[in-house]
Amino acid sequence: CLILTADQSAKYLEYYLAHLAWQPDEVVLYGKRYVTERKVVWYGDAEYQYHYSGSAKQALLWHPALFRLKQHIEQLVGHPFNSCLANLYENGSQAVGWHSDDEPSLRSPQQENVVIASLSFGATRKFCFKHKFKQEKIELMLHSGQLIVMRGQTQRYWKHALMKSSKITEPRLNLTFRYFYPTLQR
């Protein structure tokens, strides 16, 4: 659902592009380390270390503007978040492939379900879900100011991806708010 006006979204995009501590992302595929085209930064309540795709990210303490937005999203979603992985795709040639956010550090000891709230800014992009066991696929066009919430069994049964598009020349930024359990990281 759209939670921000076009004007609010444009202001957030401009501010976050200029003020977040963007760094190239790294992943390990088949034992080889790659630097991706997209940029990322991870913020949180503490200086957590988050491991995914064979690499480690060190959380920075919350940027004040990001923290205020987190509090707003927590009220909308009805779920607490203690971290945010921010992703920057500078144009449509930058994407993220099929994956699930199912790391043990994202699941509480009491339940297996992961809750991720993802807020988009900038270019409208195609975001897809693909069922892990069935031939089922869902395509969404994510607009600036739009929030989607992945919860329940989403990460267990579905993979998701941001698709490439050579026609898109504008940036897309998305903020993925998560609850991170540092003691459960393996």
Each language-model region and where it sits:
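Non-heme Fe(II) oxygenase metal-center motifs and adjacent flexible, charged/small-residue loops
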Residues: 1-186
